[in-house]
């Protein structure tokens, strides 16, 4: 029996949230449920699980310790780190995932790497990509994955037969300045409106609606780290109250030829 005080237990279990099901997805036929859960109330590493509704049997579908290796520490892209900070996400492992319309396949990221899995056969494999991956989303038909990498939105086949996929929208593709990004939510949307994504698949998987964000009007702030005065200050665009916000527009692209 644990002799920890309540404050110690509350901290160790991350406010009594570890070990409970979260990010729940019910299949369209109601036969299975996909969810995230760690192995115990003091385990911070989330795994992906599949529940068969009729039998009540649970199957672990994806284990980060197997996918990355038990000795590999998480190396999060800046976008994923910011998302977790906004959501007060203290757990590790798989903290988000996406499924197709029938919950037959899923995609997730670990340390900026893209993984796709089959929920029927329970296998997981990595898809090679260009740069770190953020916010991957499966197309409704389960054939394609759209994801953000840097300031661009890319699309890749789940079969991995199109080497690294293709860039669907990005400042390099359109010869735009480095204040422009595609596929990510702007600061105000993510921080104040609880909208953390910047692109959406069409129901027929043929098109993607993508946010274009231009931060050129946003004021630049310089933030220094008092603990490391030898390091230069970071330049950050921050839309303080009463100042200009980013310019945001929505565009629709054909996802595949």
Regions found by a protein language model. Give the residues of each.
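Beta-propeller folds
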Residues: 1-257
């Amino acid at each position: 029996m644990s002799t920890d005080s309540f404050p110690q237990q509350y901290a160790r279990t991350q406010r009594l949230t570890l070990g409970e099901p979260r990010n729940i997805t019910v299949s369209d036929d109601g036969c299975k449920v996909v969810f995230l859960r760690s192995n115990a109330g003091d385990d911070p590493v989330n795994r992906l699980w599949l529940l068969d509704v009729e039998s009540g049997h649970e199957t672990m579908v994806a284990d980060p310790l197997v996918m990355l290796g038990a000795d590999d520490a998480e190396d999060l892209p800046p976008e994923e780190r910011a998302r977790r900070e906004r959501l007060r996400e203290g757990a590790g492992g798989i903290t988000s995932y996406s499924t197709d319309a029938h919950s037959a396949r899923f995609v997730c990221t670990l340390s900026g790497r893209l993984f796709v899995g089959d929920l029927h056969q329970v296998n997981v494999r990595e898809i090679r990509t260009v740069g770190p991956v953020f916010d991957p989303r499966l197309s409704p038909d389960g054939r394609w994955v759209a994801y953000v990498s840097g300031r661009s939105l890319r699309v890749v086949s789940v079969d991995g037969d199109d080497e690294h996929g293709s860039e669907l929208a990005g400042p390099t593709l359109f010869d735009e300045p480095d204040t422009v990004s595609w596929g990510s939510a702007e600061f105000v949307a993510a921080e104040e409106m609880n909208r953390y994504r910047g692109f959406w698949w069409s129901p027929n998987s043929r098109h993607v609606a993508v946010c274009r964000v231009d931060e050129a009007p946003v004021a630049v702030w310089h933030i220094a780290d008092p603990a490391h005065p030898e390091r230069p200050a970071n330049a950050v665009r921050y839309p303080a109250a009463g100042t200009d916000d980013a310019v945001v527009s929505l565009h629709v692209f054909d996802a595949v030829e």
